[in-house]
From Swiss-Prot:
Homodimer. InterPro entries: His_Pase_superF_clade-1, His_PPase_superfam, PG/BPGM_mutase_AS, Phosphogly_mut1. The keyword Nucleotide-binding does not apply. Pfam families: His_Phos_1 (PF00300). Substrate binds at residues 9-16, 22-23, 61, 88-91, 99, 115-116, 184-185. Pathway: Carbohydrate degradation; glycolysis; pyruvate from D-glyceraldehyde 3-phosphate: step 3/5. GO terms for molecular function: phosphoglycerate mutase activity. GO terms for biological process: gluconeogenesis; glycolytic process. NCBIfam families: pgm_1 (TIGR01258), PRK14115.1 (NF010713). Its EC number is 5.4.2.11. The gene is gpmA. SMART domains: PGAM. This is 2,3-bisphosphoglycerate-dependent phosphoglycerate mutase. CDD domains: HP_PGM_like.
Amino acid sequence: MTRKLVLLRHGQSQWNLDNRFTGWVDVELTDQGRQEAVAAGKLMKDEGLQFDVAHTSVLKRAIHTLQGALKELDQDWLPVSKSWRLNERHYGGLQGLDKAETAAKHGEEQVKIWRRSYDIPPPAMDVDDPGHPCHDRRYATLDRNALPGTESLATTLVRVLPYWHDAIAPQLKAGQTVLVTAHGNSLRALYKYLNDVSNEQILELNIPTGIPLLFELDDNLQVRSFRYLGDPEAAKRAAEAVANQGKAK
């Protein structure tokens, strides 16, 4: 039996548009981002996908993308689970900074390492910083020591995998079709795990906003195939645009 899993990065956010490091900052979708959510829903509808359950983060750009896509799918009624473990990677002291200005200051190669390397985190956010997640009531029930002040992709994967094993994988093994709407780096972490991508290869992976990525898995959740829905060239161009965000102007 083929299991189906769709990974969907949220639509364009205001800070995507502004080219700023976002991380755990809870920013809104742009008008384009809301349109991308609807377009993603249409692509999934055209594919004939009928989901049994959906998962998302506790950040509204992902939540609102999921809501827009499900409305277009006429599957608003689906049970939705929200977890901080699907949040974007925490960008530490870079959060809120302009990516191009940061590249001009520190060099494009350093910014690429911070953005796309596997195990090198950006400079940490101090725990006394008002933006640290320990001061956000949505994380009030969590162990303060579990809340990051910065993350690499490696530590993001460590955060995401328990949710995969405890929540998503059992549903897939039960034959359910699952939609996960999350963020560039939490989805890169899942992609790396599912496709057994090397630490070096993951550096070059960029996930575009608002384009569903369909995985077909076997009974053991090994990947049989994966592809972006819609025009492959459009997905390629969108991924290249993500890669260019970390370059100096």
